[in-house]
Design a protein with these regions (language model features):
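Conserved beta-strand signature within the Rossmann-like core of class I S-adenosyl-L-methionine
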Residues: 148-154
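Short, glycine-/aromatic-enriched active-site segment of Class I SAM-dependent methyltransferases
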Residues: 155-173
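Short alpha-helix
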Residues: 174-190
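Core SAM-dependent methyltransferase catalytic element
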Residues: 207-248
Length: 248
């Protein structure tokens, strides 16, 4: 990993550790619950499936998925992965009642898992923070099982002009692409059945808005109507060979 990308990842780790300390990780559930629930419905999670929650934060989505895959002859498992160790600490503390979910500190650029393992991968509101999105997609391809499904959900993308206001305000670098650019990127990595879906935020909008990101409630309502971008893709029916050597 290059020094620049490592430095960018360290910036992300530091920022989200700070978010965790300030309780912002828990706030994400309220902000993203609507678009996430709609995405989970499209994923059609089944008992026994193995799922990766990439950029899991405090683990609220991981716990939802753990319930969905729990029952069956062989209970499924959810792995939550996040670069911020404080987020992972909070995720573990909040998941003691879930036997089939585990949380790991790690990078999307070097996913600490074996090849061809996960039936499904979900990433909620984290993919645009990855300094090398191509490498992340290659890693996801590696750890997905043959015919495994990938779901990437993001609010920050160029086609939603309201979201571009965040770029200069964020303290860490982000990647900003159009829907079509993301679709083409997935296809370059030989994912199949690539498609993009807009997921509107169905939560009620207050009549008065006093936040910092929108001029008024009407802008917030329009932002929700445009919706988040959900990228869906499938790994072909092939296995990725393990590396030729291992370092112990």
């Amino acid at each position: 990993m290059s020094g620049g990308k490592l430095n960018a990842e360290q910036q992300v780790r530091n920022e989200f550790n700070q978010w965790a300390a300030e309780g912002k990780g828990e706030e994400m559930e309220a902000h993203h619950i609507s678009i996430t629930e709609q995405t989970l419905a499209m994923m059609s999670l089944k008992p026994g499936e193995r799922v990766l929650d990439l950029g899991c934060g405090t683990g609220w989505t991981s716990r939802m998925m753990a319930k969905a895959v729990a029952n069956g002859d062989q209970p499924g498992q959810v792995v939550g992965l996040d670069v911020a160790d404080e987020m992972i600490r909070r995720a573990r503390a909040g998941s003691v009642d879930h036997d089939n979910v585990m949380f790991v500190v790690g990078s999307a650029l070097e996913i600490p898992w074996e090849e061809n393992h996960f039936d499904k991968v979900l990433s909620v509101e984290s993919f645009y923070y990855y300094a090398d999105q191509d490498r992340a997609l290659a890693e996801l391809f590696r750890v997905l099982a043959p015919k495994g499904e990938l779901y990437i959900l993001i609010n920050l993308y160029r086609d939603n002009h309201y979201s571009l206001r965040w770029v200069e305000e964020l303290k860490i670098p982000v990647q900003v692409r159009t829907e079509q650019e993301y679709v083409e990127m997935l296809k370059r990595h030989t994912y199949e059945d690539v498609r993009a879906v807009r997921v509107p935020d169905l939560t009620p909008t207050p009549e008065e808005y006093s936040g910092r990101w929108f001029k008024n409630a009407e802008e917030l309502r329009d932002f929700k109507r445009i919706g988040a971008l959900l990228l869906i893709a499938r790994k072909p029916d092939i296995e990725v060979p393990p590396p030729a050597y291992q370092v112990y």
